[in-house]
Amino acid sequence: MTDSYQMEDIKNSNETSISLQNVTISYGDSDAVRNVYFDIPKYKVTSLIGPSGCGKSTVLRSLNRMNDLISSCTLKGLILFEGLDLYSDQIDPVEVRRKIGMVFQQPNPFPKSIYENIAFGARINGFSGNLDELVEDSLRKAAVWDECKDKLNESGYSLSGGQQQRLCIARTIAIKPDVILMDEPCSALDPISTIKIEETIHELKKNFTIVIVTHNMQQALRVSDKTAFFNAAEKGGTDDGKVGYLVEFDKTKKIFNSPKEKATQDYISGKFG
């Protein structure tokens, strides 16, 4: 990344964190999702919902360039973060992923101690402060400090599934991102662990912008401020596959209580999906 594009120097005073402008994402010659427009607000939770195959996870991964790891994946259009083109040739994808962190569907702690799960990433990113304080602060923000404080030197694998997922959230927090992406973070967890994660999300939005993919309609309603509903349609022509598209984006309560589109109403009422 060149000096003129240092992401930590980019601060936009408006209320938008990330803006997608006519985004089409393809794998090879096949479009996965087309013509997506919406703005992700700062310090809010935005949910991406829709049936399997509608492109919501593909869109989520595009927000921090995780799709770059798939050689056949290409993107057209613009994704702006604080007004900066994330796909500019002058932007370092590694720096993008530091500013826009990701929590995956399955808990994936490092094969290290609980302490090192937090400290390792901060250390390799040049953190020069008090690591003990950083570890405690990150674990507290992820609501897992009480479960971890007496066994910081034990393996991250010693924790339960829900605790491991909150450890992964703490690990992401420790890098000091601006945005946290979550790809179905509760799908592998029991109901009690899910409640803990949702409570954590409510607390995290005080300091972070959060984007979450979920198949759980009630979860989207509980945790998010804005919701984007995606659907999939037949591509037509010689291609018998489907392509995802954004149907509707609005305040979550409006999406669930008075959606503009019939497809949205049908999906949230369980008629398909």
Swiss-Prot record:
Keyword Heme among UniProt keywords:
no
Can you state which reaction this protein catalyses?
phosphate(out) + ATP + H2O = ADP + 2 phosphate(in) + H(+)
Q: Which subcellular locations apply to this protein? A: Cell inner membrane
Q: Which residues bind ATP?
A: G50, P51, S52, G53, C54, G55, K56, S57
Residue intervals of the ABC transporter domain: 18-257
Single annotated GO MF: ATP hydrolysis activity
Superkingdom field: Bacteria
Isomerase among keywords:
no
Q: Which UniProt keywords apply?
A: ATP-binding, Cell inner membrane, Cell membrane, Membrane, Nucleotide-binding, Phosphate transport, Translocase, Transport
Q: Which GO terms describe its biological process?
A: phosphate ion transmembrane transport
Q: Which PROSITE patterns match?
A: ABC_TRANSPORTER_1, ABC_TRANSPORTER_2, PSTB
The membrane topology noted for this protein in its Swiss-Prot or TrEMBL record is: Peripheral membrane protein
This entry carries the following GO cellular component terms, namely: plasma membrane
E.C. designation(s): 7.3.2.1
InterPro entries, per this entry? AAA+_ATPase, ABC_transporter-like_ATP-bd, ABC_transporter-like_CS, P-loop_NTPase, PstB-like
Its biological purpose is as follows:
Part of the ABC transporter complex PstSACB involved in phosphate import. Responsible for energy coupling to the transport system.
Quaternary assembly: The complex is composed of two ATP-binding proteins (PstB), two transmembrane proteins (PstC and PstA) and a solute-binding protein (PstS).
The family this protein is said to belong to? Belongs to the ABC transporter superfamily. Phosphate importer (TC 3.A.1.7) family.
What is this protein called in UniProt?
Answer: Phosphate import ATP-binding protein PstB
Q: Which organism is it from?
A: Prochlorococcus marinus (strain SARG / CCMP1375 / SS120)
